[in-house]
């Protein structure tokens, strides 16, 4: 994680890819952090892949809405408007108490308009 904080994204990807944990929250965060590194490198296809893995590895009220949101934002960048819409809608209905649900209707409307 220190490499990510120091903007050394290649090393962040390298070391986080080797990270293994039985803790599902830590696994989700490490996978999502790889997505963050790829996103910072403007490698959006890879970022999308890792954000999707991160929210699928463990459905929970903490990490799932974070990585659903990040996945949806990158999906918009990639022109995957239906995927973005689905993820934003899932946040609205399944994670309505999350921070990511705040103003989610704006994002849903944007994705819907672009579909």
Question: Where are these predicted regions, by residue range?
Answer:
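Short solvent-exposed coil/turn linkers within tandem alpha-helical repeat scaffolds
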Residues: 6, 18-28, 57-63, 91-102
């Amino acid at each position: 994680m220190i490499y990510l904080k120091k903007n050394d994204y290649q090393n962040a990807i390298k070391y986080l890819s080797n990270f293994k944990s039985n803790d599902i929250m830590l696994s989700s965060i490490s996978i999502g952090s790889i997505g963050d590194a790829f996103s910072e490198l403007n490698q959006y296809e890879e970022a999308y892949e890792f954000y999707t893995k991160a929210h699928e590895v463990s459905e929970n009220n903490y990490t799932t809405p974070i990585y659903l949101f990040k996945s949806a934002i990158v999906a918009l960048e990639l022109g995957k408007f239906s995927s973005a819409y689905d993820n934003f809608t899932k946040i609205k209905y399944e994670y309505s108490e999350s921070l990511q649900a705040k103003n989610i209707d704006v994002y849903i409307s944007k994705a819907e308009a672009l579909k």
